[in-house]
Swiss-Prot record:
Gene behind the chain: nadD
Single GO MF annotation: ATP binding
Keywords, ordered alphabetically: ATP-binding, NAD, Nucleotide-binding, Nucleotidyltransferase, Pyridine nucleotide biosynthesis, Transferase
Annotated protein name in UniProt: Probable nicotinate-nucleotide adenylyltransferase
UniProt KW 4Fe-4S keyword: no
Pathway the protein acts in: Cofactor biosynthesis; NAD(+) biosynthesis; deamido-NAD(+) from nicotinate D-ribonucleotide: step 1/1
Similarity comment text for this entry: Belongs to the NadD family.
Catalytic activity: nicotinate beta-D-ribonucleotide + ATP + H(+) = deamido-NAD(+) + diphosphate
């Protein structure tokens, strides 16, 4: 990555469906915040993700509310409803352009899991998107070697990226939804406020 401009704020964007948000997301955001000296991590729940179908069980409003609950006690985490409000597919490049227009004196870092990074060359306007920001790649134990995936993507796109040094968890939103559907426990897998919201609103009970 190029040297940071000391005059610019450094904001990381963590996008995802957060269906539901869990401690793996929080660990990723916290480690990115400190390892890359970010001023803030902006959480960006997807409205209608174009690259994968959105699993049922929670509305856009529910997913947004759960993220807000999960990060409520962190002074350097913030949540945006930009993609939730915007009609149509939630294209990352449109989100990034909007943020850059609103805050032109900011250096942007997109936090992405290695599983999503593998598909980045197929994303909408991928080449321009790769150029617009820095990329922080979070490893996953079930998604292959992060360095190898990054080399493969860098051969196709002009990407400036670094790999996050963080625990490689297998925890996923899919697993949590399955646990809830079969009446299992999600205690310690999500923040208590998120678990309470899920139980109170009876989310993810139907397969």
């Amino acid at each position: 990555m190029s040297p940071p401009d000391p005059q610019q704020r450094r904001i990381g964007i963590l996008g995802g469906t957060f269906n539901p948000v869990h401690h793996g997301h929080l660990i990723m955001a916290e480690q990115a915040l400190w390892q890359f000296n970010l001023d803030q991590v902006l959480w960006m729940p997807a409205g209608d993700p174009p690259h994968k179908p959105l699993a049922a069980g929670a509305s856009k409003a529910d997913r947004l509310a759960m993220v807000k609950l999960a990060i409520a006690d962190h002074e350097r985490f913030a949540c945006s409803d930009l993609e939730i409000r915007r009609p149509g597919p939630s294209y990352t490049i449109e989100t990034l352009r909007s943020l850059m227009q609103e805050q032109p004196d900011t250096q942007w870092y997109w936090i992405i899991g290695v599983d999503a990074l593998r598909d980045l060359p197929q994303w909408y306007q991928a080449e321009e998107l790769a150029r617009l920001c820095h990329w922080i790649v979070a490893p996953r134990i079930d998604a292959g070697d992060a360095a190898q995936v990054l080399r493969s993507v860098a051969a196709k796109l002009p990407i400036r990226a670094a790999i996050l040094d963080a625990p490689t968890l297998t925890l996923s939103s899919t697993y949590l939804r399955q646990q809830i559907q079969k009446g299992g426990s999600i205690r310690y897998l999500v923040p208590p406020a998120v678990e309470h919201y899920i139980r109170q609103h009876r989310l993810y009970l139907d397969p």
